[in-house]
Design a protein with these regions (language model features):
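Juxtamembrane and targeting peptides
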Residues: 1-92, 228-230
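Structured, amphipathic secondary-structure segments that form assembly/contact surfaces
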Residues: 90, 98-224
């Protein structure tokens, strides 16, 4: 989209958004209760034909199963994904651990806590965003054996590209910095993985932020560190 393309050449002070990005990035820390232990089949923007075709087939099958099991629809999920993006951003800026515990998976929350606790006393962060849109890139289903000898539970993971205009500001504790402004918001294009348990009581949460779309495009080039082979 235009917003995603605009983020590739933005040359503003990126410290605030990089601080937020580090807090949002989750690295799986082993099997956690009530979630999958890792991201299933990490999505990359540029894939070979065979892998792309296989991925499409897997997503189509997973979509049909989600529709029958939880009444999943693409429009309603995209709306929820956009809202969750905003809710996580606001809770992260406020260092609201209680809200984050409801919005992200346990492993994702554990990865956020060091950055939140390292903030200087008296420092304030703020996050505002608008025009948030989410596009689905991949859907996967997997099982996880729960701790305590419980039966396996099924989970869904949906990878989305999230496009948003946002402003992230830091003030207090001797520092003032911002990414974007109300007049010229920063165009952010992120790739998020959302996860939920199927069945009763399941809700979508952030599993992991994979990075910006431009970062993933660079690492998935044929000569890059990612794989672009089929």
């Amino acid at each position: 989209t235009t917003g995603c393309a605009g983020s590739l050449s933005a040359r503003r002070d990126m410290r605030p958004i990089m601080l937020a990005a580090r807090s949002l990035s989750s690295r799986p820390l082993g099997q956690a209760r009530h979630e999958l232990s890792t991201v299933v089949d990490r999505w990359t923007p540029q894939q070979g034909f065979i892998r792309a075709w296989g991925g499409w087939a897997n997503s189509t099958l997973a979509l049909a199963q989600l529709q029958s099991s939880i009444g999943f629809t693409v429009p309603s999920f995209k709306a929820r994904a956009a809202i969750l993006f905003e809710e996580v951003g606001v809770a992260l800026a406020r260092a609201d651990e209680k809200s984050l515990a409801d919005l992200v998976t346990p492993s994702c929350l554990r990865s956020m806590l060091p950055a939140l606790k390292a903030r200087p006393r008296g420092q304030r962060h703020s996050w505002t965003s608008h025009g948030v849109t989410a596009s689905i890139k991949q859907i996967r289903l997997a099982h996880a054996k729960q701790t305590g000898g419980e039966e396996q539970r099924r989970y869904a993971q949906v990878t989305c590209v999230v496009d948003a205009a946002m402003v992230y500001e830091i003030s207090g504790a001797g520092e003032t910095a911002s990414t974007g402004s109300s007049e010229a918001p920063h165009q952010l294009c992120d790739v998020w993985v959302y996860e939920r348990a199927l069945g009763d009581g399941g809700s979508w949460r952030l599993k992991e932020r994979l990075g910006t779309l431009s970062e993933l495009q660079q690492t998935s080039q044929p000569n890059g560190t990612g794989s672009a082979q089929g």
